[in-house]
Regions:
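Conserved class I S-adenosyl-L-methionine
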Residues: 58-67
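Nucleic-acid modification enzymes, centered on SAM-dependent nucleic-acid methyltransferases
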Residues: 3-57, 77-78, 83-196
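Glycine-rich SAM-binding Motif I of class I
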Residues: 69-73
Length: 196
């Protein structure tokens, strides 16, 4: 225990004033980081800095509130084993998709299977508060189809679910007002919870 304490003390003396993460570009890091927005997310440079200061390659890094998986992904990118835990189903999907991604070929194959197997589902049972967010002629039936077909238990499907969550919950429009997202933009003050 004494050796562990002295190691931690030695590492805490390491350049605390040299917070390089503060000066990293906003979009710095692995291409999976911006997969989906998430409340209370932090820039990837923060976990990277602390992972490199307090762990060695091969160590296990556990994030008990993984959110969108920033710290576990940074751990993996840094040669550590990244593990994330979170009660949120969205957080689970995002973290799992980032730390255990499928191959590009398996993703493309699954997309092809979904495209070929598409049959327009009945959307009459979709609640009005959900229906109002999507184009009922095209987008809503496709989302219902994907909800019915994709499983969070399969690696490829988790990756597609995580990617779709980002597309569904984005809010960026370019100068021509073309959106690459499938829902209307909502501020963080809007809640889908009943009676909010």
């Amino acid at each position: 225990m004494e050796a562990l304490t002295s190691t931690i003390e030695e590492r805490t003396k390491l350049r605390w004033d040299d917070n390089n993460w503060k000066h990293l570009p906003k979009r710095w890091g692995h291409s999976f980081h911006p997969m989906c927005s998430y409340l209370a997310m932090f820039p990837p440079g923060i976990p990277r800095y602390f992972i490199e200061q307090f762990t060695e390659p091969g160590d296990i890094v556990l994030d008990p509130f993984s959110g969108r998986g920033t710290a576990p992904l940074e751990a993996c990118v840094s040669g550590r084993v990244g593990i994330g835990i979170d009660l949120s189903p969205l957080a689970h999907i995002l973290t799992a998709a980032k730390v255990d991604p499928p191959s590009l070929n398996s993703v493309l194959k699954r997309i092809d299977e979904l495209r070929i197997g598409y049959k327009r589902p009945n959307v009459d049972d979709v609640p009005d508060d959900i229906r109002m967010l999507f184009d009922g002629r095209l987008t809503l039936p496709q989302i219902v189809y994907l909800r019915n077909e994709l499983s969070h238990r399969k690696r490829v499907d988790r990756f597609l679910l995580a990617s779709l969550a980002g597309i569904l919950h984005g809010g960026y429009n370019d100068a021509m007002n073309n959106s690459s997202y499938l829902s209307i933009s909502m501020p963080n003050t809007f809640s889908m919870s009943p009676n909010y």
